[in-house]
UniProtKB/Swiss-Prot annotation:
Entry's family note: Belongs to the fluoride channel Fluc/FEX (TC 1.A.43) family.
Protein name: Fluoride-specific ion channel FluC
Any Gene Ontology biological process: cellular detoxification of fluoride
Domain of life from the UniProt record: Bacteria
Native source species: Salinibacter ruber (strain DSM 13855 / M31)
GO molecular function, one term: metal ion binding
Protein topology in the membrane: Multi-pass membrane protein
Role according to the record: Fluoride-specific ion channel. Important for reducing fluoride concentration in the cell, thus reducing its toxicity.
One cellular-component annotation, GO: plasma membrane
Pfam families hit by this protein: CRCB
Activity regulation (UniProt): Na(+) is not transported, but it plays an essential structural role and its presence is essential for fluoride channel function.
Compartments in which it is found: Cell inner membrane
Signal sequence segment: none
Amino acid sequence: MLKLLWIALGGSLGALCRYGLSVLARWGLPPTVPWGTLAANLVGCFLIGGLWVLAAQYSFSEELRVFIFTGGIGSLTTFSTYSLESLLLLREGRVWAGLANVLVSNVLGLVLVAIGAGCALFLLGGPVAAFGA
């Protein structure tokens, strides 16, 4: 039961961060691309890469892991919204914008997971066995 409370708390914080990123991403950018969702997903990719390394190195408790990964990052990132927005762009005839959203989200997402993990490994001074290094 306590684990569910940690997930709910992390989820609340992640959702608030996602909303904040969506608001910030709208400032000065053209509404042709769903910038808020893209920003949330890319920030989440970076965070999950780095925090996964730290969790392995410092043996985060199960409660802390579900708070961060299931609750926080799980509610910050949003695959379903990303998929819907990409589909809507395609259905509106904005094929290049839709395909660019898919390509940028996936390629930069993978790159940012790797960069986040690399940053954490650098800060730790080397490979972390539990991360597969």
